[in-house]
């Protein structure tokens, strides 16, 4: 067992309440709100951090219909997939999913529930807002929160009737249809909602062996229901949500490295089409109880996922069905009320994940390799987050989290008739801390500084590898130092930050696709600056601009890649958009024009596979035809810029996945109420 400590942070988080409780209440501020993101408007953790919140109308205007399109509205975030949608490659502030495709650098939450890693890329249904927290969020969110947190908050049913249907078509025979109905079942007591979604995003890649010409896309069917029991004049409420998602995809589609404008896949003669089917079931029970001084939240959530995946890899045909089960329980207590000197959040957390993988690599004439593996991972944690309001302008915050992680693996198989197998167990303890301080220079201008830790627990490879023992990799740990500012008025919003993150014992994937193994690759340093601004220069009109410059490198004492750039981290990025409303006698017109720039980055630790700088231009025009009818047209990637989204070495040559190119579409929404 190994205990990791950072005494100044952990002790600071523990001692802060004792110091603060010796002070008298000196201010009168708004009530602390506990949201699905665990943050509140008064807490230091919410104010002394770089964050972005995007509303549902802003998501709709930008055409964000799935989580992998969130970079359009969340500056600094990069999301692609490595092979297919099961394995997201995410980077934020120089922290990258190159470290582990099964544990993205940024964790996705939906209504406060962490999603399975293989469910990070998903369609969005009935979203109310999306929140991005940058930098390690380990004290509140625990493992795999080194780069930050994406929290999706969905619309909860209440006494207001809501309902709509949506429909749209776009390039490559793609289409989208959606139905939503929400409101009171018995007003003052019980509320409910239902959402149905069918989303087809076909590709245009060609397999010469089969003649298929629509590869590289996805087809998703999703349904969810919610019930909310909230009696009037009672201090408690309960909720239940259930959803099912099934997606079929043909995304394991690659072209030659230098053939990014081509449509023919780089495959051996006679290779079948790639195919993947993923089905995910989710259930959540929640409860809230409110007193004069405290609010208590309880969440219990379960996810079950199974997928089948077949794809050609050189002369081999790979079959990799997999099953996942995850359950999460969390009890959280937070202070309520005005004029508090100290605000506090305390919580207990448990997460248990179980996985089974069957894999088979077959040659045209005989089996090459087959294996069956079982892995488990469990986290037990207790956390505390505290804010001491020294004056009405100055506050300090501190937090501490104690986590106990354990994992196990058991696998067996055969390679060319030779059996192999092993098993193992490991456990680890972590103590994480964070400290921050913020000061309001004026009523509109805040400056802050923050030190925070993040980590990824020790564990085992998900995919068994012949010839390798069941040896665990050690926990990966990081610490982030940040200095930032935020300025906000009715017309201007501006935030900027500079940061430095040091990561040690990085967990990095290496090896051929389908046979990658995780190992600790040493240390890395990431430094950068970021800027985000919005100017509301006229009624109904706004101009957004953002940019970042990041240097993320393995240190010289890293065993495998010393001095190299960390994969999947662009050296710089920028974006700008103009949004407006033009009133006419025939209804409001809503134009939008957006440009996004992504800097050069690598797909491998050896820095041999490089994607250069590229920019895309998106445009849309909405028309509010009546109070209840909205029609919009959009053109994404107006100039049809083609670029690589992922690549790897296939023997002595490299192959790449490429983006879809220009997409033209039209959408219609009709509201019922």
Curated annotation (Swiss-Prot):
Origin: domain of life: Bacteria
Motif mapping: TonB box: 30-37
Listed GO MF terms: siderophore-iron transmembrane transporter activity; signaling receptor activity
Keywords of the record: Cell outer membrane, Ion transport, Iron, Iron transport, Membrane, Receptor, Signal, TonB box, Transmembrane, Transmembrane beta strand, Transport
Additional observations: Weakly expressed by yersiniae located in the liver and the intestinal lumen. Strongly expressed in yersiniae located in the peritoneal cavity. Moderately expressed in yersiniae located in the spleen. This probably reflects the availability of iron for yersiniae.
Family, as annotated: Belongs to the TonB-dependent receptor family.
Job of this protein: Receptor for the bacteriocin pesticin and for the siderophore yersiniabactin.
The name this protein goes by in its record: Pesticin receptor
Native source organism of the sequence: Yersinia enterocolitica
């Amino acid at each position: 067992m190994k205990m990791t400590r950072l005494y100044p942070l952990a002790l600071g988080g523990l001692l802060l309440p004792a110091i603060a409780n010796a002070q008298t209440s000196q201010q009168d501020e708004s009530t602390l709100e506990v949201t699905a993101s665990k943050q509140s408007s008064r807490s230091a953790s919410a104010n002394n951090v770089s964050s972005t919140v995007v509303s549902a109308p802003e998501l709709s205007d930008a055409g964000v219909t799935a989580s992998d399109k969130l970079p359009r509205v969340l500056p600094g975030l990069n999301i692609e997939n490595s092979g297919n949608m099961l394995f997201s490659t995410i980077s934020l502030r120089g922290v990258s999913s190159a470290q582990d495709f099964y544990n993205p650098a940024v964790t996705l939450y939906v209504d406060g529930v962490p999603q399975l890693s293989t469910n990070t890329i998903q369609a969005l249904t009935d979203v109310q807002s999306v929140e991005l927290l940058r930098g390690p969020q380990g004290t509140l969110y625990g493992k795999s929160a080194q780069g930050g947190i994406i929290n999706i908050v969905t619309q909860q049913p209440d006494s207001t009737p809501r309902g709509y249907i949506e429909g749209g078509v776009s390039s490559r025979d793609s289409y989208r249809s959606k139905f939503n109905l929400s409101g009171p079942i018995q007003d003052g007591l019980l509320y409910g909602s239902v959402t149905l979604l069918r989303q087809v995003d076909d590709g245009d890649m060609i397999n010469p062996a089969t003649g298929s010409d629509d590869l590289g896309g996805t087809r998703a069917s999703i349904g969810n229901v919610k019930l909310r029991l909230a009696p009037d004049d009672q201090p408690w409420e309960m909720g239940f949500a259930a959803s099912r998602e099934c997606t079929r995809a043909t995304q394991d589609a690659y072209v030659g490295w230098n053939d990014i404008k081509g449509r023919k896949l780089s495959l051996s003669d006679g290779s079948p089409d790639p195919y993947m089917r993923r089905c995910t079931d989710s259930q959540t029970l929640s409860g809230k109880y409110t007193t004069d001084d405290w609010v208590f939240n309880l969440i219990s959530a379960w996810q079950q996922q199974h997928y089948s995946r077949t794809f050609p890899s050189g002369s081999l045909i790979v079959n990799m069905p997999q099953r996942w089960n995850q359950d999460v329980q969390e009890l959280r207590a937070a202070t309520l009320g005005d004029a508090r000197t100290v605000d506090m959040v305390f919580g207990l957390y448990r997460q248990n994940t179980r996985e089974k993988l069957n894999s088979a690599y077959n040659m045209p004439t005989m089996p090459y390799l087959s294996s069956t593996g079982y892995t488990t991972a469990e986290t037990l944690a207790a956390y505390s987050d505290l804010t001491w309001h020294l004056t009405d302008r100055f506050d300090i915050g501190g937090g501490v989290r104690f986590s106990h992680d354990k994992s196990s693996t058991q696998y067996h198989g055969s390679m060319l008739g030779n059996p192999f197998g092993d098993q193992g167990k490991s456990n680890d303890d972590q103590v994480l801390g964070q400290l921050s301080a913020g000061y309001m220079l004026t009523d509109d201008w805040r400056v802050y500084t923050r030190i925070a830790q993040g980590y990824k627990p020790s564990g085992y490879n998900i995919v068994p590898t012949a010839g390798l023992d069941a040896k665990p990799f050690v926990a990966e740990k990081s610490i982030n130092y940040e200095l930032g500012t935020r300025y906000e008025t009715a017309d201007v919003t501006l935030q900027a930050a500079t940061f430095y993150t040091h990561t040690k014992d990085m967990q990095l994937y290496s090896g051929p696709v389908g046979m990658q193994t995780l190992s600790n690759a040493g240390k890395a340093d990431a430094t950068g600056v970021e800027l985000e601004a919005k100017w509301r220069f006229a009624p109904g009109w706004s101009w957004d601009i953002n940019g970042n410059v990041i240097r993320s490198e393995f240190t010289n004492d890293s065993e495998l890649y010393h001095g190299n750039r960390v994969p999947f981290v662009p050296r710089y990025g920028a974006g700008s958009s103009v949004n407006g409303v033009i009133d006419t006698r025939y209804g409001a017109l809503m134009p939008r024009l957006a440009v996004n720039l992504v800097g050069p980055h690598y797909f491998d630790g050896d820095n041999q596979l490089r994607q250069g700088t590229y920019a895309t231009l998106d445009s849309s025009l909405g028309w509010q035809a009546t109070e209840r009818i909205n029609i919009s047209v959009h053109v994404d990637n107006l100039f049809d810029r083609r670029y690589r989204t992922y690549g790897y070495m296939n023997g002595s040559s490299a192959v790449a996945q490429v983006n879809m190119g220009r997409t033209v579409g039209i959408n219609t929404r009709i509201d019922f109420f």
